[in-house]
């Protein structure tokens, strides 16, 4: 069960990471 939680958290980090960076770049570009 812990392995599944670790995999899902890792997947969230892998997906959310680039999204947050893209949002930051968009905000800087709009300014």
From Swiss-Prot:
It is a single-pass membrane protein. The keyword Ribonucleoprotein does not apply. One of its GO terms (biological process) is photosynthesis. It comes from the Eukaryota. InterPro entries: PSII_Ycf12_core-subunit. Keywords: Chloroplast, Membrane, Photosynthesis, Photosystem II, Plastid, Thylakoid, Transmembrane, Transmembrane helix. It is found in: Plastid, Chloroplast thylakoid membrane. GO terms for cellular component: chloroplast thylakoid membrane; photosystem II. Its main location: plastid. The keyword Secreted does not apply. Belongs to the Psb30/Ycf12 family. PSII is composed of 1 copy each of membrane proteins PsbA, PsbB, PsbC, PsbD, PsbE, PsbF, PsbH, PsbI, PsbJ, PsbK, PsbL, PsbM, PsbT, PsbX, PsbY, PsbZ, Psb30/Ycf12, peripheral proteins of the oxygen-evolving complex and a large number of cofactors. It forms dimeric complexes. This is Photosystem II reaction center protein Psb30. It comes from Phacus acuminatus.
């Amino acid at each position: 069960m812990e392995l599944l939680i670790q995999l899902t958290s890792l997947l969230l980090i892998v997906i959310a990471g680039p999204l947050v960076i893209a949002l930051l770049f968009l905000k800087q570009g709009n300014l």
